[in-house]
C-alpha cells in the first residue's frame, strides 16, 4: 500500500445496531477492492474484523477494528465499532477517530436502539453520514418500510440515492436515483433504463435530492425555483456541501454477504465524504492549557492521539493512534505531552484487523499503530518537543454494573491483579474498586455480557479462574438514644496485672466520624490513658452491634473511672473502653442506616411512566423531570443503593436498550424496619456460618 496524504484519506466509522451487518459491509469492501482474497465471515471464523476468539464464539463484534481499503486513488479507513450496548467503550474509541459515519440498518429490522444511539452520536459530533440499508435480499426485508422508518425517526435530511429492483420477492438490481439508471446484478457494468414500475418513485426521490441540493447554495436555490435543471458539476457541488454540513444524508442499499451495493457505496464515500485535509484547522491546547490551532496538513508539526491500547502476549503493548497533524516517521523521538516523557517510535504499522503491515511513515489524517511505547496510554498525545500540544480526551462511558470477584485459588491473587490492570489499560470502560471496608474487589462493567467477556478473557488469556457474587451494600449503624455504660478490665495472673476502668456516655451527634470528649474530674482517670480509651472506642465503631456495620454519628464522652497505680496500662483502658461499648451501645437505641443514591436516568419520553413506576417499587423519590429534547426525558430520583444493584440490566430491559443512567452516593438514611430486620438477620446468619 502506498503512502496517502491528508487530501486522499477518509476515515469512516461504522455504527448501527448489533447484528445489522456492519462488519460484513467492511468484509465486502475488503473483498471487492481485492484487499482480501475471500469474503470473511464471523460465523466461520474467517472475518478480518471480528477475529478475536470471544467474537467468533459469540458471533458479534466486541472490539473496534480498523481496515483500510484503496479505492480510485484514495484510502478509506473503515473503523468498525461494536453495536451491542455492553461494548460502548470500544465504540467510543472508534467514533473518536472517525471523520464521517456509515450507519448500517437491517432491511428487516429497521430503526433499532443502536440506530438511535448512532444518530445521537453523529448529530452531537456533526459527522457527515450515509445510511446503508443492508440485507436487502433477506426474506421479509423491505427497503420502503426501512427508509420510511429512517425518515420518520430522523427527518427529511434522510434521502434515498438508490432503490432496489424487485422481481417477485427477489432483488435483481438497483436504480441509481442521481443518474436515473438501473443496474442489474447479472450485468453490473451496463446501465439500463429505469423499470416503468419505479419511474414515479425515482422522480419523487430525485426531486427530494434536487431540493436538498438547492438549499446548499443561493445560486442553486435561484436556479431550482426558476424550474431549471442542475448540471453534473452543480449536483456534485451541492451534494458535497450538503453531505458535509449534514443537510443531506444519503440512503443506499445492498447485501454485504452478496457483495451488492458495495461499489456504489465506495464511490459515494469517495465523491461526497470530506477528506481529512478539509478540516483545515483543529483545536488543541499547549501544556499550560492555552488554545492552539493546528493545521491538518503534512507541513504542520507532528501530533497524534492514542485512541486504543492492545496488550498482546507476544508483541507487548500496541498503541493505535491517529496522526492529527504532520508526519510520523519510524525511529523518530516524540514527546508524550501528558507524561512529559520522550518515546521512540521503533516501528510504525497500518492495521487491517489483527494484521499489522510495517510502514516507514504515516501522514496527516491516517490511522496506524506503534508497538512497545513505554509510558503511553489511551488518550495520551504524542507531539514534538518544539510544539507540544494536547487534544481533548475521549470520553468513555462510566460502567454501572458491579460484581465482587476473587480468584478460585488464593495463589492466583497476584496474577488476577496483574491481569485486571492490563485489561483496564485496554478497556477504559472497565473500573475496579478495591473496597477496604468490605474487603472486596468489585469489577464494574457496562453490562452482564461485558463482564462475562472480561471473566472469560481472564481465564483464557491469563489462566485465572474467577468466582463472583453480588457486591455487599455498605450499610451504617448509629444510635438515637443516650446512655452511660461502665467498662472494667481487671486481670491478675500472678505477675504484673492489668487494670482499667471507665464510664462512657454515648449519644447521637451530626458528625459522621466518632466525636470523643472527656469530662473526667479529679484525676479519676489519668490523662495519659485518654488516647487508649479513644483508640479502643474507635476500633469498636468499625463494627456495630446490630449487623456489624461501621458506626457513624456517635459522640462518646469519658466521664469517670478509676485506675491502679501499678496495674493500669494503656492496653487495659483500651479493653475497658471496648467493654463499655459492648454494654452501652445495645441500650442506646441503635438503628441501621442505608445508603441513598442520586440517580439520573435518560430515556425516550414514552418510557417515563414505566420508569417512575419502577422507581416507586424501589422505594425511590422522584426529584424532578426535564425534557432534554422533544423526544427524550431526564428523570432525577433518590433511591436506596441496595435497590439499584442490577439496574443497568433492568433499565435496558425496560427501555429496549434506549435508556441510560448514572448514580452517585448521596447520603445515609434510617432503613425501614422490614429492610433493617432482613439485613440484620442475613448478617447474623453470615456470622453463624
Locate the predicted segments by residue.
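Structural and coupling elements of P-loop NTPases
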Residues: 1-689
Amino acid at each position: 500500500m502506498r503512502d496517502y496524504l491528508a487530501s486522499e484519506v477518509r476515515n469512516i466509522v461504522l455504527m448501527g445496531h448489533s447484528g445489522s451487518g456492519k462488519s460484513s459491509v467492511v468484509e465486502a469492501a475488503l473483498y471487492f477492492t481485492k484487499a482480501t482474497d475471500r469474503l470473511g465471515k464471523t460465523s466461520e471464523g474467517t472475518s478480518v474484523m471480528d477475529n478475536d476468539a470471544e467474537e467468533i464464539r459469540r458471533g458479534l463484534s466486541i472490539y473496534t477494528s480498523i481496515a483500510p481499503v484503496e479505492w480510485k486513488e484514495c484510502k478509506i479507513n473503515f473503523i468498525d465499532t461494536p453495536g451491542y450496548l455492553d461494548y460502548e467503550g470500544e465504540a467510543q474509541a472508534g467514533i473518536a477517530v472517525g471523520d464521517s459515519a456509515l450507519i448500517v440498518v437491517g432491511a428487516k429490522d429497521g430503526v433499532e436502539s443502536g440506530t438511535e444511539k448512532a444518530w445521537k452520536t453523529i448529530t452531537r459530533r456533526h459527522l457527515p453520514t450515509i445510511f446503508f440499508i443492508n440485507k436487502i435480499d433477506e426474506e421479509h426485508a423491505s427497503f420502503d418500510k426501512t427508509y420510511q422508518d429512517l425518515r420518520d425517526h430522523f427527518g427529511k435530511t434522510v434521502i434515498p440515492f438508490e432503490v432496489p429492483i424487485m422481481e417477485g420477492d427477489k432483488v435483481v438490481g438497483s436504480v441509481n436515483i442521481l443518474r436515473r439508471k438501473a443496474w442489474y446484478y447479472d450485468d453490473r457494468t451496463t446501465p439500463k433504463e429505469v423499470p416503468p414500475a419505479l419511474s414515479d418513485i425515482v422522480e419523487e426521490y430525485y426531486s427530494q435530492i434536487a431540493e436538498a441540493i438547492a438549499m446548499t447554495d443561493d445560486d442553486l436555490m435561484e436556479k431550482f425555483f426558476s424550474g431549471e435543471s442542475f448540471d453534473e458539476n452543480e449536483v456534485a457541488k451541492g451534494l458535497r456541501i450538503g453531505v458535509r454540513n449534514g443537510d443531506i444524508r444519503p440512503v443506499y442499499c445492498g447485501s454485504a454477504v452478496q457483495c451488492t451495493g458495495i461499489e456504489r457505496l465506495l464511490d459515494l464515500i469517495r465523491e461526497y465524504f470530506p477528506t481529512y485535509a478539509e478540516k483545515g484547522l483543529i483545536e488543541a491546547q499547549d501544556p499550560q492549557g492555552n488554545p492552539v490551532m493546528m493545521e491538518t496538513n503534512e507541513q504542520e508539526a507532528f501530533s497524534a492521539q492514542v485512541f486504543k491500547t492492545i496488550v498482546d502476549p507476544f508483541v507487548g503493548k500496541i498503541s493505535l493512534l491517529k496522526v492529527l497533524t504532520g508526519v510520523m516517521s519510524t525511529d523518530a523521538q516524540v514527546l508524550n505531552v501528558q507524561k512529559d516523557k520522550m518515546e521512540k517510535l521503533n516501528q510504525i504499522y497500518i492495521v487491517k484487523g489483527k494484521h499489522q503491515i510495517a510502514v516507514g511513515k504515516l501522514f496527516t489524517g491516517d490511522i496506524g499503530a506503534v508497538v512497545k511505547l513505554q509510558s503511553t496510554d489511551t488518550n495520551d498525545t504524542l507531539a514534538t518537543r518544539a510544539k507540544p500540544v494536547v487534544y481533548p480526551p475521549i470520553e468513555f462511558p462510566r460502567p454501572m454494573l458491579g460484581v465482587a470477584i476473587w480468584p478460585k485459588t488464593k495463589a492466583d491473587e497476584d496474577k488476577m491483579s496483574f491481569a485486571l490492570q492490563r485489561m483496564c489499560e485496554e478497556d477504559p470502560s472497565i473500573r475496579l474498586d478495591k473496597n477496604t471496608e468490605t474487603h472486596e474487589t468489585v469489577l464494574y462493567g457496562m453490562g452482564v455480557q461485558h463482564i462475562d467477556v472480561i471473566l472469560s478473557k481472564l481465564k483464557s488469556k491469563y489462566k485465572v479462574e474467577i468466582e463472583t457474587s453480588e457486591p455487599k451494600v455498605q450499610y451504617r449503624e448509629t444510635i438515637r438514644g443516650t446512655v452511660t455504660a461502665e467498662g472494667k478490665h481487671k486481670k491478675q495472673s500472678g505477675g504484673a496485672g492489668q487494670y482499667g476502668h471507665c464510664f462512657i456516655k454515648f449519644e447521637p451527634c451530626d458528625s459522621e466520624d466518632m466525636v470523643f470528649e472527656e469530662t473526667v474530674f479529679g484525676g479519676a482517670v489519668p490523662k495519659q490513658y485518654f488516647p487508649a480509651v479513644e483508640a479502643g472506642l474507635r476500633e469498636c465503631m468499625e463494627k456495630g452491634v446490630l449487623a456489624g456495620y461501621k458506626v457513624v454519628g456517635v459522640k462518646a464522652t469519658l466521664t469517670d473511672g478509676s485506675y491502679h497505680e501499678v496495674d493500669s496500662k494503656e492496653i487495659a483502658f483500651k479493653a475497658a473502653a471496648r467493654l463499655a461499648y459492648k454494654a452501652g451501645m445495645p441500650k442506646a437505641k441503635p438503628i441501621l442506616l442505608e445508603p441513598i443514591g442520586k440517580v439520573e436516568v435518560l430515556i425516550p419520553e414514552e418510557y417515563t411512566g414505566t420508569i417512575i413506576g419502577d422507581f416507586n417499587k424501589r422505594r425511590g423519590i422522584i426529584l424532578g423531570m426535564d425534557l432534554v429534547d422533544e423526544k427524550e426525558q431526564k428523570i432525577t430520583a433518590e433511591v436506596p443503593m441496595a435497590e439499584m444493584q442490577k439496574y443497568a440490566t433492568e433499565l435496558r430491559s425496560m427501555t429496549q436498550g434506549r435508556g441510560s443512567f448514572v448514580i452517585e452516593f448521596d447520603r445515609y438514611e434510617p432503613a425501614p424496619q422490614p429492610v433493617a430486620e432482613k439485613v440484620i438477620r442475613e448478617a447474623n446468619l453470615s456470622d453463624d456460618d
